[in-house]
From Swiss-Prot:
Residues in compartment: Cytoplasmic: 1-12, 61-77, 142, 213-218, 270-276, 329-702
Organism: Enterococcus faecalis (Streptococcus faecalis)
Membrane topology: Multi-pass membrane protein
Gene name of the record: vanTE
Annotated protein name in UniProt: Amino-acid racemase
SUPFAM superfamilies: Alanine racemase C-terminal domain-like, PLP-binding barrel
Gene3D superfamilies reported for this sequence: Alanine racemase, Lyase, Ornithine Decarboxylase, Chain A, domain 1
């Protein structure tokens, strides 16, 4: 899919230049009429264009899904614009005092009027207008939906239009005259966040909604010319025959702005401007300051009083100043490159994740989707990093064990569905709703209590088909009752296979019984006319040993991370896996220990000869089993094996460097080079060994 922002980004430069023109009147010395028809008419599309950008990139997604992340994006935007407005107020405070926009003698109501509607300097109205408009449209979208929001915003624009370019006409109507007298007691202009901004935010939202269907069209070009010519004649008529209060709003301006924006979405210029959003924002903020400076200089250099030359100089200087500030920002900014973890870390391979998912997709039916199981910090590998990589390759459904994990994943920016597999106390129901999570109903009582909270939440129904851990009784009457609860939006039903990891006859019999029972429940629900939603019963071993099953989802955990749980248990379907994680730690010091000396805690390790000992910055608090102490663990460095000696400490371990070449302090060693082998030797499964990896380990995604 082509990138829709290229044309938008480049036009930001033109739009910023138009704004400068509006404030400098470039044709005044040559042909003032051109300022009327070009600067104060055609160039008026510039500010609506910027508001439409906000509607498109910020509110478009929100209009379709009021998710936690989309709401957070709006809150962050409002905070950002608020801070920019505050800094801009401080920057222009001396000039605001000089031109009388603000005064220390003003009363509170007048100051509020200036700060909330007019702006403390003539161009700063944009920021409070953006804040007010965004808040207003967000509230309207949430309460009345997109179509009515567009209708309401259009009505507001028409009211504003009557107090702007059409004021000379509306002012003749007594009732309207009283209305605008009241409005102007609160704001100098109707060009504000109440009357002006909302309609253009809505047009940006509309453009977002139709962008995927949008194709290049000559009709768009024709419509733009028709509307821009029509708006020009509208402007000429109003300026010639009426008393225009202001000329920011025209009847045909929304149509011109919308058609222009749709054309720009189709425009894919080869020229790309880096950081165009930041660059044009700085130009917008700084250009009045440049205007003041150029005006002051023009007193001594008369040629600069030529309006066109004045305009060009202001434009060039504004862009140069903005670019210099961006360059300074880059130098002052802390490097985005990750600081190497000096102690210990996990290196996660994105390519290995992609490989494993591709191998899994070869096994499962084409109509079956993958749920990424990222509970227990993605089996110790890093929940946020793994989920981020899975999202990139099309996985949009995730499973966690607890609500705390679910909230952390959502706060990381994850946009997918998040299913909580475990029990969540009903008192946390507000959090389930707030973060748009999907809660498993793990028992009849759990479902009843959640429903009594009278807060609608998304759910999956977990059925106990024979594992006897969590799940409602496999009684179709009880299950039917759950589906009828008014506050539980049950979107799926699932179970968990207790013995799918084994091909022994008793395990196969148990698994087949569970599958049979689950299918019968689905069949009975279907006969009852209940739409039971998504279905899933297989986890990693369920797809390897029962590949013939076909449900809506499979829950993939250990296979995603490149391991089998137990390499001694054969599977019906082989799979080529690549481990995604390497555990690394630094060599932080070394010393020579004489023969006969003990090393580490206790008397378990006594060197028989003069030995070079190193200290590696990782221990059992980081998930390295203490049971591996004293030569049971082998580390690696550049293909060389390094034996661990002595008892593994909480934060460190000792290694024998006697036979190791070319190793220096702060070099990184691979601590668990063969996780599956270690799990086998410790008589456990790789799931346990991985999930032990501690939170102190940093995570590097490569």
């Amino acid at each position: 899919m082509k990138h829709r922002a290229n044309g938008i980004d480049l036009f930001r430069i033109f739009a910023a230049t138009m704004v400068v023109a509006i404030h400098t009147f470039p044709f005044q010395s040559i042909a003032p009429f051109l300022d009327e028809v070009i600067t104060l008419t055609v160039f008026r599309v510039a500010v609506p264009f910027f508001f439409m950008i906000t509607g498109y990139f910020l509110l478009g997604r929100l209009s379709l899904n009021f998710s936690y992340n989309n709401n957070q994006r709006v809150k962050k935007y409002l905070y950002k614009i608020g801070m920019i407005y505050l800094y801009s107020i401080l920057l222009y405070f001396p000039l605001s005092l000089l031109n009388g926009t603000i005064s220390l003698k003003m009363n509170i109501l007048l100051l509020l009027k200036v700060f909330i509607f007019d702006g403390t300097f003539y161009h700063l109205w944009y920021f409070p207008a953006s804040i007010i408009g965004t808040i207003l449209v967000t509230l309207l979208l949430r309460s009345i939906g997109f179509k009515l929001t567009v209708a309401f915003s259009t009505c507001l624009y028409l009211v504003g239009l009557g107090g702007d370019s059409w004021y000379g006409i509306t002012n003749q109507v007594p009732l309207l005259n009283k209305l605008y007298t009241f409005i102007f007691s609160w704001s100098d202009y109707t060009r504000s966040g109440v009357f002006f901004t909302p309609v253009f935010l809505c047009l940006g939202i509309f453009a977002y909604r139709v962008s995927k269907k949008l194709t290049a069209s000559k009709i768009l070009n024709l419509l733009f010319y028709v509307f821009i010519i029509g708006m020009t004649f509208e402007s000429i008529f109003l300026h010639r025959f009426t008393n225009v209060k202001h000329d920011s709003m025209y009847l045909l301006l929304p149509s011109c702005a919308l058609i222009l924006f749709l054309m720009l979405l189709n425009w894919q210029p080869k020229l790309k401007v880096k950081e165009s959003a930041d660059l044009t924002l700085l130009v917008y903020i700084l250009h009045p300051l440049v205007i003041v400076i150029v005006h002051s200089i023009s007193k001594y250099i008369p040629i600069l009083k030529n309006s066109l030359l004045n305009f060009l100089l202001v434009v060039v200087c504004s862009f140069i100043l903005a670019q210099l500030l961006l360059n300074l920002k880059r130098k002052l900014r802390v490097s985005k490159q990750k600081i190497p973890f000096e102690r210990a870390s996990k290196e996660i391979s994105a390519s290995a994740i992609h490989h494993n998912i591709n191998e899994i997709r070869k096994i499962i039916p084409k109509n079956t989707n993958i749920m990424g199981v990222v509970k227990a910090n993605a089996y110790g590998c890093g929940m946020v990093e793994v989920a981020y990589e899975l999202e990139k390759i099309g996985i949009s459904f995730f499973c966690v064990a607890t609500i705390e994990e679910a909230i952390a994943l959502r706060k990381s920016g994850n946009q997918g569905d998040i299913l909580i597999l475990g029990y969540t106390h009903p008192n946390r129901i507000n959090d389930i709703k707030k973060y748009n999570l999907i809660q498993s109903i793990v028992s009849e009582e759990h479902g009843k209590v959640l429903n009594l909270k009278k807060i609608p939440i998304r759910c999956h129904l977990q059925v106990d088909t024979g594992m006897h851990r969590l799940g409602v009784t496999p009684n179709v009457t009880i299950i039917q009752q759950m589906y009828l609860f008014s506050n539980l939006k049950i979107e799926g039903i699932y179970s968990h296979l207790g013995s799918s990891d084994s091909l022994e006859q008793e395990s196969i019999a148990r698994t087949n019984t569970q599958i049979f029972l689950f299918n019968n429940i689905l069949s009975d629900l279907e006969q009852m006319g209940i739409s039971y939603g998504y279905t899933h019963i297989q986890s990693s071993y369920g797809i390897l040993n029962y590949p013939e099953l076909s449900f809506d989802f499979v829950r993939i955990g250990i296979l995603c991370y490149g391991f089998l749980s137990d390499y001694n248990s054969p599977t019906k379907i082989p799979i080529d896996l690549q481990p995604i994680v390497k555990v690394k730690a630094s060599l932080i010091t070394e010393r020579i220990v004489e023969a006969g000396e003990y090393v580490g805690y206790g008397l378990g390790a006594k060197v028989e000869k003069r030995t070079r000992i190193g200290v590696v910055s990782i221990g059992y608090a980081d998930g390295i089993p203490r049971a591996l102490s004293n030569a049971k663990l082998t580390l690696e460095f550049k293909g060389q094996s390094i034996k661990q000696i002595g008892n593994i400490c909480m934060d460190m371990m000792l290694v024998d460097l006697s036979e190791v070449e070319d190793i220096s302090l702060n070099d990184e060693l691979i601590v668990l080079p063969n996780i599956s082998k270690i799990a086998d030797e410790e008589q456990t499964i790789t799931n346990e060994l991985l999930s032990r990896l501690g939170s102190r380990l940093g995570t590097e995604l490569n």
